Amino acid sequence: MPKAKKRVSLASKASSRLPSSGKPSQQASIPNVELSSTVTSNSQVLNNDPLKETKKDKRKDRHFNWQQKFSNPKISASARKRRNRKARENLKVNVSSIGEVLPEIDLDISVANSRLKPVIKDSLSSKQTKSSMKRNTVEEIERFQAILKHPSFVSNPLETVREHLGNSLDSR
């Protein structure tokens, strides 16, 4: 299937709007012009006809409309100055309100610090080499076997663990 031919002018666009018979109708070919008015140039007819408005004309119109937004100020200069002055005054910080809040913040911080539990240093993960991990494992196994062989643990294990925890937590 061949490519569709690209339209290169607005005239071809206008021809596509013709009635299905292919012939322009009587109303489409004759513009609405009063008999008493005289046309001074062909450019006026082209500018009034939306089908023949060029891309350049459209761009000029769009640019003109865009410029009109800035040429008509919406507010007077005194109102603009008044608004700017109020905005500057609202930016000033009231330090007295901060001074009233500071004691409450200090109290909250001290309460939060007192609630923090001390971190047990042994529970922190530290980087260990393979050999130190192996040595610690062997020491832990020996310590656990010594506890299991202890006579107080053999007689009453729960009481011994409770006593050990009480002694170790009091020292910390």
Curated annotation (Swiss-Prot):
GO terms for biological process: maturation of SSU-rRNA from tricistronic rRNA transcript (SSU-rRNA, 5.8S rRNA, LSU-rRNA). Residues 12-47, 65-75 have a biased composition (Polar residues). One of its GO terms (cellular component) is 90S preribosome. Residues 1-88 are annotated as: Disordered. InterPro entries: Slx9-like. It holds the Pfam family SLX9. Keywords: Nucleus, Ribosome biogenesis, rRNA processing. GO terms for molecular function: snoRNA binding. Its main location: nucleus. It is found in: Nucleus, Nucleolus. Belongs to the SLX9 family. Involved in ribosome biogenesis. Required for normal pre-rRNA processing in internal transcribed spacer 1 (ITS1). This is Ribosome biogenesis protein slx9. The lineage of its organism: Eukaryota, Fungi, Dikarya, Ascomycota, Taphrinomycotina. The gene is slx9.
